[in-house]
A protein has these predicted regions:
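Active-site-adjacent structural elements in enzyme catalytic cores
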Residues: 1-175
Length: 175
């Protein structure tokens, strides 16, 4: 297992590689937004399936939200984040280069996880997905994930904080 600390995780991300880390729901694979292709490659994921942009606090994500949805975004974020809720919301026109969907929306989330929030305070928002090979149930422990992704760095310390083991609830913004 390639266990890394926060400083090494940041170096890995800046080199364009994804890392594995825990969240409040399922373990995540994440990368800096400009390197989104690597998640699709490692997961063997269909490129038509969007990724989720995670941050440490909603202020990190607000620039990614279209102006027509900011009021609703703020209201929902203040009520349900941090937590196991992913908001699919119209994306800002200035941030379209990170879009992984075809309908100009972006999934946004702030996990209720000290480790994940601490990581993203350091790195900024990360594009993420659950840490599994697409189409297969993923492991929920660092040891199991290391078997699926032996070449990827896993953020420590181990054992990870307790998570729910269930995917986040997804809500879509409608005008």
């Amino acid at each position: 297992m390639n266990l890394v600390n926060f400083k090494s995780a940041l170096k890995t991300l800046k080199r364009g590689l994804p890392i594995i880390f825990t969240t409040d729901t399922l373990p995540a694979i994440g990368c800096l937004p400009k390197f989104s292709e690597v998640i699709y490659e490692f997961k063997k994921r269909d490129k038509n399936k969007p990724l989720i942009l995670m941050g440490s606090e909603h202020k990190q994500l607000i620039d990614y939200v279209h102006e027509s949805a900011i009021e609703d975004f703020e209201s929902i974020a203040s009520k349900y984040w941090p937590g196991a809720l992913t908001m699919v919301i119209p994306s800002s026109e200035k941030e379209t280069e990170i879009l992984t969907s075809t309908d100009n929306t972006l999934g946004l989330r702030i996990p209720n996880s000290y480790m994940a929030q601490s990581l993203m305070l350091l790195t900024g928002p990360l594009l993420t997905s659950s840490a599994n090979i697409s189409g297969f149930n993923g492991a929920t422990t660092s040891e199991g994930i290391a078997l699926d992704f032996p070449s990827l760095s896993i953020l420590g310390p181990i054992p990870w904080e307790k998570s729910s083991g269930k995917a986040s609830t997804i809500i879509a913004w409608k005008k």
